[in-house]
């Protein structure tokens, strides 16, 4: 198809520059008004009012046309709900370019290049991969021992809305939260032991890690961290009495017990299993 030189120049100029730029928030309902291209382009300013009705606006058929609709009078609307997360990538300007053909009667006048910036809204809260995790710390673990916990992900694409701040919901004397950034910008979370644990005093701790994004208003989620204290064999068996005094007759039946010992051990599992034997200092007669 042949075009006059002035049309070719106009097309070339259009490819190099943006004529109009508009902004609209994502998730607006289909049919949301965006702008009046006819008024903003000022193309009708030099046309007599009686002839302005002859000027029409239409959109060049491209893939992006499915998102927007332009009326003959130059009004721009959305044709469907726009989701920034599905249309664009993280921390990049989310925009689409449409080209509007302006005609007077049937003759070609100009092509306008319109840029529509889709603004990310804070419609996603940070999400942990799980609602709850279980960590194990031992009684023998020293101060500074760390255990990793999963980080949260925010699906919003703007830096502010996807920025996540972490903290423990309540301060704890035994544990703290360490947050550092990896080379890829992802946060690395660790639960840090602040003081030696004693399972016999407390065998379980419940912590809540809060992930809060930078949106306004902000959104947040909670990761429940259950910390189970593993037993260490740090308690000896204890007899109910430090000394047992008994008397037996010489005629006592050897098959019958002369004493029942009571022993307890504060440890659990195999650490609390008790066996009995005579001390090497016990005389053979007593045995």
Residue ranges and their predicted role:
Residues 1-287:
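Extracellular cadherin-type adhesion modules in metazoan precursor proteins
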